[in-house]
């Protein structure tokens, strides 16, 4: 039994003995079922293979249709994976894609990479990027350039 809280793709399971009481309660509330676990795997596979998140118009309804599920089950799977909702989940993948493309396509600007990744609002992108990476996108690009 563990709580995934940030990047569900890279965090190892946390032993129950190390969890805070609030985290244990959160796990119980989610009531993870095999359906939720399978949906979580389907979501990750869909994002990895289809890259639907790069479409700025990709909607919750399209996501539900792609997964052939309902909003209640989706929310349980999102919370199980440590996300607050659909937007948080999509933005997570967009940010990972931005970072991946920034390394591969160094000739592109932050703005071009932002649009390529599916973000449409510069201010929302910068705010989200800074909240996750603890630096601005420009600082991130400078860091990449210094590394090479």
Which ranges hold each PLM region?
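Membrane-proximal linker segments that couple transmembrane helices to downstream signaling/catalytic modules
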Residues: 3-117, 124, 128-131, 135-148
């Amino acid at each position: 039994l563990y709580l995934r809280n940030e990047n569900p793709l890279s965090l190892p399971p946390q032993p129950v003995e190390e969890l805070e009481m609030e985290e244990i309660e959160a796990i119980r509330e989610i009531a993870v079922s095999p359906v939720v676990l399978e949906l979580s795997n389907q979501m990750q596979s869909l994002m990895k293979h289809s890259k639907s998140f790069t479409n700025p118009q990709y909607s919750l309804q399209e996501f539900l249709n792609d997964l052939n599920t309902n909003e209640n089950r989706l929310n349980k799977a999102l919370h199980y994976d440590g996300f607050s909702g659909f937007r948080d989940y999509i933005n997570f993948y967009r940010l990972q894609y931005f970072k991946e493309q920034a390394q591969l396509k160094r000739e592109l600007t932050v703005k071009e990479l932002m649009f390529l990744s599916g973000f449409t609002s510069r201010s929302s992108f910068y705010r989200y990027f800074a909240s996750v990476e603890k630096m601005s996108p420009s600082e991130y690009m400078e860091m990449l350039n210094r590394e090479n």
